[in-house]
Structure formats: C-alpha cells, structure tokens
Swiss-Prot record:
It comes from the Eukaryota. Residues 158-208 form a coiled coil. The lineage of its organism: Eukaryota, Metazoa, Ecdysozoa, Arthropoda, Hexapoda. The keyword Coiled coil applies. It comes from Drosophila melanogaster. One of its GO terms (biological process) is protein folding. Residues 31-99 form the J domain. It is found in: Membrane. This is DnaJ homolog subfamily C member 25 homolog. Belongs to the DNAJC25 family.
Amino acid sequence: MRTHGLRLVLLALLPTMALGLLEGLYCGKENCYDVLGVTRESSKSEIGKAYRQLARRYHPDLHRGAEAKAAAETQFKLVATAYEILRDEESRTDYDYMLDNPDAYYAHYYRYYRRRVAPKVDVRVVIVVVLTIVSVIQYYSGWQRYDSAIKYFATVPKYRNQALEIARDEIQEKIQKKGKNRMSKNDQRDELERIIRRVIEEKMDVKGGYAKPTLWDVLWVQLIICPYTILSFIVWHAQWFWRYTVMKQPYGREQKLYLIRRHLGMGQHQFEAQEDKLIEEYLHLKLWKRENFVAWKAEQEEEMKKKLAENPRYKAYRRYMKNHGPGRITFED
C-alpha cells in the first residue's frame, strides 16, 4: 500500500521534475520565462519591459473585489519573483542550469539557497571597513604608547629636573606668583605637571615603538604609498650595491649604523630606542665590520657566562640539574 502511494506521488511530480521545475525554488512549478512572456534569448531590457507591463496589469490596487484583488496579488508576486530571478545574471544562470539539468535535484537546492543565504554586502566594502577600523585602532594605540612614554619620562628625576630647569621662568611667572591671582596648591601641582609634560614633549626625541604617531604610519596610508615604498626599497639596495660593493666607497655614519643594526638583528624602531651612549660605543668598536662584531659578540657571551656562573640562583639551578636532571612527565603524574 505504501509502495503504491509513493508511486502516485512520484507520478504527480514527474511532469514538473521532467521540466526542471521544483516547488519552493524560483517560480515554483511555473516557468519564470513563461510568467513574463519572454524567452531564454530575451535581453535584459526586454525582460524589464515585460515586467513593467505585467506589473501594471496585475497591481492589486487596480482590481476591485476581494477575490480579484487576491488573484491579482498572487500573480503580481509571481511576476515580481520571476523578474528578480531573470534580471540578475548569476541567478538567471543558475535558473537556466536547473532547466537544462532537471536530474541534479540536490544541486538546484544548494545553488538556490546558497545565493539566498549568502551576504549581499560587497566584498570591497568589507575590505575598506576592515582597513579603516585597523587604521583607527593602530593610530589610537600609537597615541596611547606615546602618552605612556611621556608620563614615564616625567617621573624620571633626570628628565624631570631638566624640564624644571628649562621652564624655570615660566614656573615662577605662573605658579609662584602672589596676591589675589595666586593659585591653590592643587592648581599649582596640576600646572606644574602640565608644564613639565609640555617641555618633555618639545625637547624629548622619543623614538622606536613609543614615538609620536603620524598618519604616515597607519595601514591605510602605508597601502596607498606601497608602490613608492617598494620602488624606494629597490633603488636603495641598487645604490648600496653600486656604491659599496662595486665602487668600494667608504661607509658614512648612517651606513655604519645600518650594518650594525643588521648584525644585531634589530628592527629600526628597536635600534633607535637604544641609548645614544651605547650606539656611540658600537661605532667606537667598529661593529659594522663583520669580524669585529663576531669577536665582540663572543666576548659578550663569555661575560654573560661568567655573570651566570657567579649568580647564586644560577648555581643552585645547576646543582639541581646535576643531581636530579631535567623534569619528566609520566602517565602516573
């Protein structure tokens, strides 16, 4: 009995399945081309013209009576659905594929709902929004790092005293004045901190990752000037090769610092954050020469070993490793 019922259902669906028409997909059991009265060879303009004519004919407001309005509304929705499918090239291609391949039952459902569920936002818009958000966060984070660096320098006695010495006249004029215009203690403290911060910002050359951020550092600008950056990189290396490899010209200060930084394996910001005294020591030792750098590095490693050997905590660690060996993880643990 069940087998007989299943056969009846299949026989009922056979005409539409043979035509490639599936209930719930596109125009349902109707052919979208027939709904608009066009053919598969019709152009976009012909499809649009047919839609406008049928939309005026079946618009519910042009019909009177409940039954007439209901029938017109149903047909109007079908016409609108057919037009939405056929006016878009991608959905029209999928619909034609369904008509040409009625046996690919599951593929039709996948293509249809993939297009329905897929986001309609342009990928280019998403990329622009993401780049903008990253650039804003990058710029804001740069200001936070710079602000924390200035606050730190304002607490260091060396830089704080220098700022007080530079702003001595301004402090006497604004803070240490007497009479009716004399500031309260809280106002004096706030004004003093403001003056110290301003002097440090003006005089202190903060470098490295805590440097004062500029718009040139954000991702958006870097992407825009990327072709220029690549070209400059190629030209710089070509000039370096010609001047110092082919022509054997002597190195200048900037070239020496570049070689030292490369030997140390530091980035530009990290190297610029080094103290001036330490950088001058690198230059004095001529560390831009590979053989000098190798010898200096060996000496540094040897000194580090001596310091560790004299360190009580390191001695205790070595005794522990000698007696117990490295720790092991077992299944019993």
